[in-house]
A protein has these predicted regions:
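A generic structural signal for short hydrophobic patches within well-formed alpha-helices
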Residues: 41, 113-114, 125
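Active-site-adjacent beta-strand/loop module that shapes the phosphate/pyrophosphate-binding cleft
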Residues: 2, 15, 73-99, 104-106, ...
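A short coil-to-beta-strand element that immediately follows conserved catalytic motifs
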Residues: 63-72
Length: 134
């Protein structure tokens, strides 16, 4: 079974909570939804949090700090399982397209994120808000 791991890094922006999202590059993905920075484990990589950290650095150029697990979802079409980890973005975080895999990487206000994020990943936003309130 395929699996991916990624991060949902957040910060306080001028208009409230913002989250770091990326958009896949290429014509095929032009109209596709945004995503949390994520990817599949490398050969021999069995620590999903380490995978999430590596992918965030590789795709968005941001080094994740302290993280908590947000659980997983399973894509209905591909049956791929996505594991997410959340944490505050480092103060100096300056997202950039650090890989050919993405054409945009930026902090997005959470209300906008709900509209542009892959529909099956939106639950991670809800879980993040629950963790921050609890």
């Amino acid at each position: 079974m395929k699996q991916s791991a990624g991060t949902l890094l957040y910060r306080d922006g001028p208009d409230g909570l913002e989250v770091l999202l990326v958009h896949a590059s290429g014509n095929y993905n032009r109209k596709k939804p945004w995503s949390i920075p994520k990817g599949e484990p490398d050969e021999g990589e069995d620590d999903l949090e380490a995978t999430a950290r590596r992918e965030t650095l590789e795709e968005a150029g941001v080094q994740a700090g302290e993280l908590i697990a947000l659980g997983s979802i399973r894509y209905s079409k591909s049956k791929k399982t996505i594991y997410a980890f959340a944490g505050p973005a480092p103060a100096e975080a300056a997202p950039r397209c650090a890989s050919w895999e993405v054409d945009q990487a930026r902090f997005v206000p959470i209300d906008e994120a709900r509209k542009i994020l892959h529909p099956e990943q939106v639950v991670f936003l809800d879980r993040l808000l629950q963790c921050r309130m609890g």
